[in-house]
UniProtKB/Swiss-Prot annotation:
The gene is nuoD. Belongs to the complex I 49 kDa subunit family. One of its GO terms (cellular component) is plasma membrane. NDH-1 is composed of 14 different subunits. Subunits NuoB, C, D, E, F, and G constitute the peripheral sector of the complex. Pfam families: Complex1_49kDa (PF00346). This is NADH-quinone oxidoreductase subunit D.
């Protein structure tokens, strides 16, 4: 759309009159392949000069039909699909799905397995926030912090590789526990990392919050008031930056989070600055949680002993026919949760992540619905961008921290 008003105004006219010489309203495409959109996101942007009048997100470019596919796979097979939605905090999807199925089954997760889940989930949250911090500051024109953030993230990925064998898409959490126990070298290496990380977080906050350039670029930009944030369904750091104290780990505790001591960082203005600062401070809380978890990491089993849920150890397959039968049924037919429906919310790096699962008594879910925080948070983009400048729109997108695999699914 383009509108022009071409009035004959003298070239020596005063500035307030010269502004009316030519006014244009243009609609442009940003994306779907554009570095500032943090994925395959297409934005229809209506501009008046540099001012953003309207932003309409167009999604679906990364749609893979995860939810429908999961309805045609057994509950165990679906574990391979869940980490591929939010590939930056994949442990969050693994955990949320496992908790929902365990609620259907009435499975009992051993204390050691719960603690391992918390440790890996918070490490994954740290890794995700480091990507957010590095790429967010990169969008504001700062190249060096990007390398600083990825330095620590590389250490976390090394820890994941020791435990799961994978740096991404870990497939480590299982229904009723975790795949296997932690390797011997994991805890000592994790403690070394935890000694360094608090100082790094202090450096990140100083680099960001104390920089007058970042302050001018981020403060007062993309403001989302608390009442608007609630109406739009925002969760996670984007909601807490607006001053709303809501964290699923506190409101609806799971995996023993109610027994951990940690704070919920809040913002004051709900702008780009607060959304970035809240996530930096959340990293400190994740370190606190991991340290507490290490102190209570007692020896014990890591899977529910129920043979209907957990396959038998491989060494029993050579001596026990009963173990062979359970093993065969587990990997061919799977288990059959009773009829019912559950919704389990969790706190991912991007906000409330929930799995709604309906069971008809079969070995496959009748319905799976994922409450993905990136999808919900993205709908605040038109409100946050209206009236801002084009370069600020890039910063606003980064501050919402969307993952397009989480949006499209």
């Amino acid at each position: 759309m383009r509108e022009e008003f071409l009035e004959e105004i003298p070239l020596d006219a005063p500035p307030e009159e010269a502004k009316e010489l030519r006014t244009e309203v243009m609609t442009l495409n940003v994306g779907p392949q554009h570095p500032s959109t943090h994925g395959v996101l297409r934005l229809m942007v209506t501009l008046s000069g540099e001012e953003v009048l309207e932003v309409v997100p167009h999604i679906g470019y990364l749609h893979t039909g995860f939810e429908k596919t999961m309805e045609h796979r057994t509950y165990l097979q679906n574990i391979t699909y869940t980490p591929r939605m939010d590939y930056l905090h994949s442990f969050a999807h693994d955990l949320a799905y496992a908790l929902a199925v365990e609620k259907l089954l009435g499975a009992v997760v051993p204390p050691r397995a719960e603690t391992i889940r918390v440790i890996l989930n918070e490490l994954s949250r740290l890794a995700s926030h480091l990507v957010f911090l590095g790429t967010g500051l990169l969008d504001l024109g700062a190249l060096t912090p990007f390398f600083y953030a990825f330095r620590e993230r590389e250490t976390i990925l090394d820890l994941f590789e020791w435990v799961t064998g994978q740096r991404f898409h870990h497939n480590y959490i299982r229904i009723g526990g975790v795949k296997e126990d932690l390797p011997e070298e994991f805890v000592p290496e994790l403690k070394k990392f935890l000694e360094v990380m608090p100082h790094r977080i202090d450096e990140y906050e100083a680099l960001f919050a104390e920089s007058p350039i970042f302050y001018e670029r981020a403060r007062g930009v993309g403001v989302i008031p608390p009442e608007v944030a609630i109406d739009l369904g925002l969760t996670g750091g984007s909601l807490r930056a607006s001053g709303v104290n809501y964290d699923v780990r506190k409101a609806y505790p799971y995996s023993g989070y109610e027994t951990y001591t940690f704070d919920v960082p809040l913002g004051e203005r709900g702008d780009v600055f607060d959304r970035m600062l809240v996530r930096i401070r959340e990293m400190r809380e994740s370190v606190k949680i991991i340290k507490q978890a290490l102190e209570r990491l007692e020896p014990g089993p890591v899977r529910d002993p129920n043979p209907q849920i957990t396959p038998p150890p491989r060494h029993l397959l050579e001596t026990s026919m009963e173990a062979v039968i359970y093993h065969f049924k587990h990997y061919t037919e799977g288990f059959h949760p009773p009829k019912g429906e559950v919704y389990v919310p969790t706190e991912s790096a991007r906000g409330e992540l929930g799995y709604y699962i309906v069971s008809d008594g079969g070995s496959m879910p009748y319905r799976v619905k994922v409450r993905a925080p990136s999808f919900v948070n993205l709908q605040s983009l038109p409100y946050a961008c209206k009236g801002e400048q084009v370069p600020d729109m890039v910063a606003i997108i980064a501050s919402l921290d969307p993952v397009m695999g989480d949006v499209d699914r």
